[in-house]
Amino acid sequence: MKLKVFALILGMALSIAFASSASAQFVEKKTVSLALAKKMAAASEAEAAKNNWTMVFVIVDDGGNLVYLGRMDGTQIGSIEVAQGKARTALNFKRPTKALQDTIDMGQPHVITLDHITAVQGGLPILLDGKVIGAIGASGGTSAQDEQCAQAGLNALNEK
C-alpha cells in the first residue's frame, strides 16, 4: 500500500513539474498585424501613385506567411510572385534584398545558387526593437522604384 501511495505522489509531483516547465517555454513576440500591414501598404501605394507607377505590395510576418497582398490596377501579374520573393528573402536574410543584389553585382554570383532567394532590390525587413518581425516587398517598377515604395511603407510605421 505504501508503494502505491508513493508512486501516486511521485506521479503527481512529476506532472506538476512538467506542467510548470512547459508553461515557462512560451514566449511573447511582436508580429505584423493586418492593421499594421494595411497602413504600410497604403503608404507604399500612395508613393507609387504619386509617381504614376503601378506596383504590387506584399507584407509577410516573421514566419514568412502572407499578411497582405495588394496589386494596383494595371500591374503585371508576374510582379505578385516577385514581390513575395523579395519580402521572404528580406525576412530570411534579415537585410534589404539590395544587399544580396549588390553581392552579385560585385562579382560574387554564389548568392544565386541559394534556394528560394530573390536577390533584387525592393524587399526590406520590418524591425521592432532590433528584431525582424516581418518584411515588405514591392515589385512593378525598376528595382529602385520598388524599394522607394517599400521604404515608404516602412516609414509609415514611424507616423502616428
Predicted regions and their residues:
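Positively charged n-region of N-terminal signal peptides that target proteins for export
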Residues: 1-5
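Bacterial N-terminal signal peptides
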Residues: 7-19
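Flexible, solvent-exposed loop/hinge segments and secondary-structure transition points
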Residues: 22-160
